[in-house]
Swiss-Prot record:
Signal peptide: none annotated. Belongs to the methyltransferase superfamily. RsmJ family. It comes from Salmonella heidelberg (strain SL476). This is Ribosomal RNA small subunit methyltransferase J. Gene3D superfamilies: Vaccinia Virus protein VP39, YhiQ-like domain. It catalyses: guanosine(1516) in 16S rRNA + S-adenosyl-L-methionine = N(2)-methylguanosine(1516) in 16S rRNA + S-adenosyl-L-homocysteine + H(+). Keywords: Cytoplasm, Methyltransferase, rRNA processing, S-adenosyl-L-methionine, Transferase. It comes from the Bacteria.
């Protein structure tokens, strides 16, 4: 995949070359999207809109730390949607990981989560965030146990992941109508990089075959159900819907 690769660390240790080789990235000086190594983290920038700033994954500080400490925990809609109850903490495959926010929330309340991400740039951002998270004295211990990244396409991986998870979580990219600053910023940068998930409808059936309990699909409240398969089971929040579908139980 072609993208502009930039190193702002001042180091000469070849880290950028290692990064490019690991994720299959090719430097393109004229690409409007840039993956930048800064002294703090790896970030994605839209070069023709510098005011949008950089997008990076941070499980330790910022909004994620605030959500972990002061958010709803088990009371969050995503936790309710996957079925967390009492001692039941399902094993989850997040097949459209993105920046890993929902996966992190589930891991922080005790679920083991395998994140799948097919875009190499997004996977590199996630890996960078995980590396810093794993090294953190506060959250590193449980984060290593519960949150894992697998760089694959969900369309093929969902048929051969083992062991089977109890829940598959899907949050495919869908054009946002909201004008909130964060959504606007992230979506503009993300849509420029990966575009909408035009093949997302193809995820529902393999997800239902893989999950032993349920599939949860996060949708904007104005979006039709994934693959136009309606379900009476949903958790509705302001702006979003978590559609719930039955999985395929394990056979003896």
């Amino acid at each position: 995949m072609q993208i502009c690769l930039m190193d702002e660390t001042g180091a000469t240790d070849g880290a950028l070359s290692v990064l490019a080789a690991r994720w299959g990235l090719e430097h393109d000086e004229d690409n409007p999207m840039a993956l930048v190594l800064t002294p703090q983290h790896l970030e994605l920038r839209k070069r023709d809109e510098p005011k949008l700033g950089g997008i990076f994954v941070d499980f330790v500080g910022g909004a994620m730390a605030h959500r972990r400490k002061f958010g709803g925990g088990r009371g969050e809609a995503v936790a309710k949607a996957v079925g967390i109850k009492g001692d039941y903490l399902p094993d989850v495959v997040d097949a459209t990981a993105g920046l890993g926010r929902d996966a992190f929330v589930l891991a922080s309340v005790g679920c083991r989560v395998r994140m799948l991400e097919r875009n190499p740039v997004v996977a590199a951002l996630l890996d960078d965030g995980l590396t810093r998270g794993y090294a953190d004295a506060d959250i590193g211990g449980w984060l290593q146990e519960r949150l894992q990244l697998i760089h694959v396409s969900s369309l093929t991986a969902l048929t051969d992941i083992t062991p089977r998870p109890q829940v598959v979580y899907l949050d495919p990219m869908f054009p946002h109508r909201q004008k909130s600053a964060l959504v606007k910023k992230e979506m503009r940068v993300f849509q420029s990089l990966v575009g909408p998930d035009l093949d997302a409808d193809g995820l529902l059936e393999p997800a239902r075959q893989l999950a032993t309990k349920r599939v949860v699909v996060k949708r904007p409240d104005y979006a039709p159900p994934l693959a136009d398969v309606a379900t009476p089971n949903a958790i509705v929040t302001k702006g979003h819907r978590f559609d719930i579908y039955a999985g395929t139980p394990l056979t003896e």
